[in-house]
UniProtKB/Swiss-Prot annotation:
GO terms for MF: ferroxidase activity; metal ion binding
Native species: Haliangium ochraceum (strain DSM 14365 / JCM 11303 / SMP-2)
Protein name stated in the entry: Encapsulated ferritin-like protein
Top EC class of this enzyme: oxidoreductase
GO CC, one annotated term: encapsulin nanocompartment
GO terms under biological process: intracellular iron ion homeostasis; iron ion transport
Residue span of region Disordered: 96-131
Biased composition (Low complexity): 102-115
Compartments where located: Encapsulin nanocompartment
Length: 131
């Protein structure tokens, strides 16, 4: 998995960033394990082994949630988004529109594209800089 490795030299990163990276990689690994155990359980025809695999999957879910909570406690951005989107039954895109004041469906609409053929993301060139 590409995210296991640091993308910048470790000596340039704060301990906070390195610890967050460890937590994010751990979360990815736990979620991947959930998927693997579920697939194994689905494919398993022996009831006893099936039950063990489901038990193991549920343990991985617990580990993932513990890690996610650690991340939430240390990241105001994660905390804010989790408070917006989790533990509600309202439509997710409705929550997003309310939170950001914009609608994703409008942004994806073909009629909202600029008429000049641009993707609407602006120039990537820096002002005053020639190639």
């Amino acid at each position: 998995m590409s995210s296991e490795q640091l993308h910048e030299p470790a000596e340039l990163l704060s301990e906070e960033t390195k610890n967050m990276h460890r937590a994010l990689v751990t979360l990815i690994e736990e979620l991947e394990a959930v998927d693997w155990y579920q697939q194994r359980a689905d494919a398993c025809s022996e009831p006893g082994l099936h039950d063990v695999l489901i038990h193991n999957k549920n343990e991985e879910v617990e580990h993932a949630m513990m890690t996610l909570e650690w991340i939430r406690r240390r990241s105001p951005v994660f905390d804010a988004h989790m408070r917006t989107y989790l533990f509600t039954e309202r439509p997710i895109l409705e929550l997003e529109e309310e939170d950001t004041g914009s609608s994703s469906s409008v942004a994806a609409s073909p009629t909202s594209a600029p008429s000049h053929g641009s993707l609407g993301i602006g120039s990537l060139r820096q002002e005053g800089k020639e190639d």
